[in-house]
Amino acid sequence: MEAVRCRRGRENNKSPERIIRSLNHHQHDEELEEEVKTKKPIFRRVQVVYYLTRNGHLEHPHFIEVISPVNQPLRLRDVMNRLTILRGKCMTSQYAWSCKRSYRNGFVWNDLAENDVIYPSDCAEYVLKGSEITDKFQEVHVNRPLSGSIQEAPKSRLLRSKLKPQNRTASFDDAELYVGEEEEEEDGEYELYEEKTSYTSSTTPQSRCSRGVSTETMESTEQKPNLTKTEQDLQVRSDSSDLTRSNPVVKPRRHEVSTRVEDGDPVEPGSGRGSMWLQMISCGHIATKYYAPSVMNPRQKEENLRKGVLCKNIVKKTVVDDEREMIRFMSENPRFGNPQAEEKEYFSGSIVESVSQERVTAEPSLRRSNSFNEERSKIVEMAKETKKKEERSMAKVKCIPRTCLMSSSKQIKK
């Protein structure tokens, strides 16, 4: 109760002056608040002319009006905001801007940033220029990877061209190895055949007797066997390389065929012995390349080995018999009896001695007499008869009974 009385006493003790001051202060504050609420910023419209430059040439001028506050100078930011509204966002980023400004007795272009003030040229005239941005560093940076790719392209081509022949040589070497494995097993059979051909070529009438006629015939006869051998080798290599390039999956089949050859079923490419091998295939001794490999028991493998050994022995015997027949034929023929004696040929009744080997110059060829042609035709007939005999002997070895095979295998084991 006492506290309330004190407060009332204080309020009653206030002077009227203090009351008037407080009222005036409140009124002034209210007026200021009303002025702030009712007060609006005052803007102005500024006329701006701008040019655009492309390829170093000024285009026709453009005119715009920019709104800016009266108490602030015109800035480039205000113009850019207006341009983005009128012509899009890319307009401002594609050009570098500068304003026309009086300098001494003339005018200059003053480069501007975004927050820089635009100075008027004459009184209140604002002129701007927008020039295309040319970043040389960006052009160089863009051109460098292109030049690098252009330079890398020939390098990559060179590397590819170097790698391709290596791959080709690798496949070719594989083919040569495969052919070499097949040829190693057939060397024993080819040696006898080569000895026979060398002996017949050294004792033929064309190799010695035709020297007096012309040197061209002698060279052609000597080069024919070499050419045939080289042609056969090239054919085998080309076939093997083509197979490796076209069908790289054929390698396991080749390996299977090589294992079969090692087991005792040789496959020989000879043309004279083709008929015999076809007959053997018909009997069931040899499996062709194109069939899938079948699972064989150890007993069947041993039988196949024995059959292969017997086939090889029979072929060797036939070759030896053929050589003996050729030797007998050559010994019976008087023309091949004395190869070291002086050789003479008859041409229309006149005798022409053989020319020595030291003479290299080619002489004009002479026509051979009828007697020589008759002798040559006889030789050809005899050769045909021998071939027929060979074919007959090969046909006899068509199928071998198993009893003979078992007996021969027992003899081999002994």
UniProtKB/Swiss-Prot annotation:
Key word Cell membrane present: yes
Bias-annotated ranges (Polar residues): 205-229
Major subcellular location class: membrane
Composition skew (Basic and acidic residues), residue ranges: 230-242
Biased composition (Acidic residues): 173-192
GO biological process: cell division; plant organ morphogenesis; protein polymerization; regulation of cell division; regulation of root morphogenesis; specification of plant organ axis polarity
Signal peptide (from-to): none
GO cellular component: basal plasma membrane
Pfam families: SOK
GO molecular function terms attached to this record: protein homodimerization activity
Region (DIX-like oligomerization domain): 44-135
Tissues of expression: Expressed during embryogenesis and in roots.
UniProt short sequence motif Association to cell membranes, positions renumbered to this chain: 283-284
Keyword Chaperone: no
Subcellular location: Cell membrane
Stretch list, region Disordered: 171-273
Key words, A-Z: Cell cycle, Cell division, Cell membrane, Developmental protein, Membrane
Family: Belongs to the SOSEKI family.
Function of the molecule: Part of a three-gene cluster containing FLC, UFC and DFC, which is coordinately regulated in response to vernalization. Also regulated by FLX. SOSEKI proteins (SOK1-5) locally interpret global polarity cues and can influence cell division orientation to coordinate cell polarization relative to body axes, probably by guiding ANGUSTIFOLIA (AN) polarized localization.
Comment text on domains: The DIX-like oligomerization domain is required for polymerization, edge localization and biological activity.
UniProt cross-references to PANTHER family, sorted A to Z: PROTEIN SOSEKI 2, UPSTREAM OF FLC PROTEIN (DUF966)
Protein name as it appears in the record: Protein SOSEKI 2
Species per Swiss-Prot/TrEMBL record: Arabidopsis thaliana
Gene name tied to this protein: SOK2
